[in-house]
Amino acid sequence: MAQRTGRIYGRRHRRPWLWIGAGLLVPVVAAGGVIWATWTQGSPEETADRYLAAWTAQDYATMRGLVADPPAGFERAHRDFRTGLKLTGATFQRGDRSAHDGVIAFDAALRGPRDLTYTGRLRLVERDRSWKVSWTPATMHPQLKPGLSLRAVTREAEPVRVLAADGTQVNDPSAPGSVQQLIEGMKTTLPERFSTRRRTVIGLYRGNEPVKILTGDEGGERPIQTTLDLKVHRAGAQALKGVDKPVSLVALRASTGEILAVVNAPGGFNRALMGKYPPGSTFKVVTASALVAGGIRPGQRVACPGEQNIGGFPFHNAGHEDFGTLTFQDAFAHSCNTTFGQMSVDRLNGGRLGEVARSFGFGTPITPGVPAVRAEFPDPKDDTDLASAAIGQGRVLASPLNMASVAAAIASGAWTPPRLVVGERIPDQQPGTPRPLEKGVVNALRSLMPAVVTDGTAHDVSFPPGTAGKTGTAEYGSGKEPPAHSWFIGYRGDLAFSVIVEGGGAGSAVAAPIAARFLNALS
């Protein structure tokens, strides 16, 4: 609303007149005299709109004309403002509210190497019967004062941090070698997150000295969060000490599939995630699940001869030991190759065993956030091939991570894709939906696997109470006594794990004691 001031003069008998022009001096007849009123042109909002439009257009001369008492360096101040922020564009618009106490808010949107938006304020005053901007450096930005300037400064960004589950940074030179292997794997899977970047910050400066960073210094790149548990990792690394053959250990949280530890010794090749090995008798967890689903009960009597011809090929137990007739649970605990080979031919077919293997993740791409291989179960070609597959030999291949997830499935009741990296878009990542196992199968295996530790092939190993597992001796190569990889997989509570020693021999003698050291360190 236009403002007015005036005085009342004594009554005179003269004709009122109107001065129409810039001054707008208006006579107003009132009782007892005439009020001579001076009206201010326009409104604060109109002046603000003209000023902000000129600022957007970089028309500093027009802006100066709308300012009450503009300083000598007015135009230069605005050019320095634009240059300091390295702007490629800027818009200034009045906000929705009208003037209040002579102040009008405006919205600034600056475009440059780092965009900036803020709300500024114009203070309007009456000067020479019109509305003018009362200008100070704070008119350009609320935090500007005499002697201060705004600058956009570009610098190298800090490398992205990789964090363990507890927030500890793990991508530094002091990190264990196995953890560094995982970091290198993440660089392959998430190259954009590790690329060298430059970061622009906007700050207040006094001369060349920074006073305050306004934006762009929010702690750098968002860190990469992992599921690694450093306590579990240290226990695994300690358990592997002194092993004179290549050895790997993987630990998972069974209920979620979270990878807690991946340890390889020596370093170089990440065999825990990328190695493909015959799983040997650890695969009997899968075969036993198929047999139980087909009607076999843990207490059912079965034959376990020392040697059995299946499809024209001789299968034998470790040391050709003959157990005669025993329960299915005992056959599992003592790892009877002849029992599982013959029963797979008599009661299963390749398609059915393959179906159950797939329910444990075989054939499923593994995308935990670092490169990892999938477990392989090719369709058996004949009875001999099926019997070999049933005991984890032949063409069946798996990594320690794959077999740890098999143990985790029994512990939790569902196979869950393992994962290491949280909150990132992993290329080709499969849905993390758990695949529930049959309840009867889970219940049976939860009696079979503890029996391995209490009464079977691992009964001489000092495991902590509550451990369930399966030994494996996976032959490879050729000859009458071919070399073998040593395996042990298992779980205790919500912790599932696997251990492999390349060329280590019997799982009960080599891999199982390593697993026991690992679990005892956590107990």
Where in this protein do the model-derived segments appear?
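C-terminal region of N-terminal signal peptides and the immediate post-cleavage residues
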Residues: 17-26, 30-55, 60, 415, ...
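Acidic, glycine-rich loop-and-beta core segments that form the ion-binding/anion-interacting portion
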Residues: 281, 285-288, 307
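Extracytoplasmic/periplasmic proteins that interact with beta-lactams or build/remodel peptidoglycan
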Residues: 18, 83-248, 256, 485
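Short solvent-exposed beta->alpha transition segments
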Residues: 39-46, 50, 55-103
